[in-house]
Amino acid sequence: MKPYVLKFQEIRPHSEALVGGKGMNLGACSNIEGVHVPAGFCLTTEAYKRTLAENNEFTQLLQRLSSLKTSDMDAIREISETIRTLIQHTQIPSEIASYMDATLLDVGGYEMPFAVRSSATAEDLPHASFAGQHDTYLNIIGKDALLQHISMCWASLFTERAIIYRIQNQFDHRKVQLAVVIQQMISPEASGILFTADPITSNRKSLSIDASFGLGEALVSGLVSADSYTVRENTITNKIIATKKLAIYSLKEGGTETRILEKSQQTKQTLTDQQIIQLAKLGRKIEAYFGKPQDIEWCLAEGAFYIVQSRPITTLYPIPEVNEPGNRVYISVAHQQMMTDAMKPLGLSFYLMTTPATMYTAGGRLFVDITQSLSAKVSRDMMVNSLGQSDPLIKDALLTVINKKGFLPPLPTEENPSHATVSGKPPVRSIPDSSSVFELVRNSENSIKHLKQSIETKSGSDLFDFIVEDLEELKRVLFNPTSIDAIMAGMDASAWLNEHIYQWLGEKNVADKLSESAPNNITSQMGLELLDVADVIRPYPAVRAYLEQTKNPDFMNELATLEGGAETKKALEDYLQKYGMRCAGEIDLTKTRWIENPLTLIPLILSNIKNFDSGASMHKFAQGEKEAFHKEQEILRRLQELPDGEQKAMETKEKIDILRHFIGYREYPKYGMINRYFIYKLALLRAGEQLVKDGILQEQEDIYFLYFEELREVVRTGQVDYELINVRKRDFATFEKLTPPRILTSDGEMINGEYKRENLPKDAILGLPVSSGTVEGRARVILDMEKADLEDGDILVTAYTDPSWTPAFVSIKGLVTEVGGLMTHGAVIAREYGLPAVVGVENATTIIKDGQQIRINGTEGYIEILD
């Protein structure tokens, strides 16, 4: 017999598909000792399906909905209204009504007032915060009224808002069903919401309570302001008493009314201090039962607290699991690497196996525990100053943690002996020989060539042994002392030039102009060479027309039928042979590479054809060289006019030569690493394909949700835990929606820092200046490079840019990113291309709207919206 009705105490764990998120959580709360839940039951999804199962019109309407996009508003509106009317006029089968009759007798009978709440299978789940998307009805009395409101709850599954939300979150309308919670109404003196973690800072030790008089609907619907109480370790740390002009109360005959409160009550504290602590303890008990922070709806009646809902807080950033005592401080690796997307487990594995630093995972990102470095003055000062140079927001976030009273242990009165020899100054590095860049590149290319040949013969467990060995070769290449010296030589020369030329001539960031068209930069070459691909295609209108409309991932093979198709295919293949291992978010080995989906490059190629004349790559590079040379001559001439000018000019010339020789090499080690990652990926996908053939894996790309050693064990044993893979897929869907903080504490507090600058234009949007100059233009807010339809002279506004974005830089005249630092990829390439750039602009992609006219000041570090 199918369970159409379940009392709360009868609901078992993992029953989302039967009772929805709300129903399952109420069932769990009903089983917690000392927690009062108003009596009630759940009309299950089986009742929903039974009522509508044989309705052909309903089935056809669902089929129509499944093909719609969020842009199809007229169709959504029409189908929404039709479905809701249909459901409300469909009679609930008598057998379901009979089960309800019997259950209602146990929870008070039809004469009792009830709350009728929808409980969707896609609502209140850990990976999708659907709260408030479906309807709730209060103080419903009588059988007919209950049945009517049950149908109205079912119909609320198909409001326009709910339909659009499902489309956005890729939920299948045909698979989402609705259960209905029917619960005794409490007529409370007060009600509200309790968060067992601070919803603003994510601090897990701070508990937040919102409270107002009457029913909670006034608070949830935004009709009234609420008192706000903060509790930490059973101590009230903050109280804000709101003016509560209104409250909603139940009516005896059913329904609710809104009342204006007496003046004396409007400013009265809703809960006493004793009640606040009592409720906080109750919240901690519920949190402990579920094992994660909770968003709890509560009400107070006759001196007792009742819980009417509890759901996980879906917006909190996870905390790294570190078995170390005391308070800890973690710094985001994502912000240093300019890639803040969530990574899949296999991608995390390879980065962890590549880096010598100890890192921890949280929310699909990597963090480093810097607590020890902050516990001694010398290492603390070095960290704050070095990181602060490249990213002032991280510096401010670190200072915020350091200044948190009692969070970090006090500095020792005498320095730790292990730090005694540290001067606080960066070590003096030797400048490599001028031929070293050529040798480093050649050695890396030879090493990659050997890897490609050797890995082809490896399979099974031997493949994993081979990859582990080759990762040591990768680390040898990446952390070669000569390579590091070459990178630092360019960076040190840049810093020296900026500091001394500002001191001597009063000119800021002169290294930006001097870096334009520097040689040996594999990433800027990548952008310019895509212009050469555009030159090959430009004379062939049939190819251009085909590329403008094709969505076929196999388009390369179709080119052969077109005039110029063979030439186009060869140009693309040559480009992909050199750069095809790159993509957005490329440090995650699991990301789709350009060579795996060449369609990604087509919008940029078409933009290049539209925006540039033939030969633009040579012209742009030569123009950059010319401007850098003229700036060099100007600086040297002005220096020679100063006291001791010949000496200053000689020193400056030496630094300019070092800058131009070495600054481009900085991009090469990552290019080599990504090359290797792609070779590993292809080999592991072959292993995944074999696992699918052997019936062990369902899909080849399921390997992405296993860590390297786990995948190695699956290959060795032929056994896999699919529940683990499915959990990680759900977790990843959650992690994708989270924004990682720059600094995270062991309390879960997210600290992102603030800019502290004065004398800027009113309403200026602050960021970090990384490439000098001021420019005005149309903002193009682009989050996906595949949609980069850029016009010559646009200003690119995006979340971050890694090397894969470089081809877009040839079309733009300015850059704004949410993440970045002085020496991160976007900054380096912007300087080489001569583009004014401001990075580290918090929420830039939401504050700035696509198409707005903006002005960016890459010298002072701010943006102005002009319209």
UniProtKB/Swiss-Prot annotation:
EC no. given is 2.7.9.6
Name the reported effect of residue 333 to A: Decrease in RIF-phosphorylation activity
Q: Does the keyword ATP-binding apply?
A: yes
- GO biological process terms held by the UniProt record: response to antibiotic
| InterPro entries, sorted | ATP_grasp_subdomain_1, PEP-util_enz_mobile_dom, PEP_Utilizing_Enz, Phosphohistidine_dom_sf, PPDK_AMP/ATP-bd
Q: Where is this region: Swivel phosphohistidine?
A: 767-865
Mutating residue 136 to V: what's the consequence?
Retains ATP pyrophosphatase activity in vitro but cannot phosphorylate RIF
Role according to the record:
Catalyzes the phosphorylation of rifampicin, also known as rifampin (RIF), leading to its inactivation. Confers high level resistance to a variety of clinically used rifamycin antibiotics. Does not show phosphoenolpyruvate (PEP) synthase activity.
Which named protein is this? Rifampicin phosphotransferase
From which source organism is this entry?
Listeria monocytogenes serotype 4b (strain F2365)
Instruction: Name the gene.
Output: rph
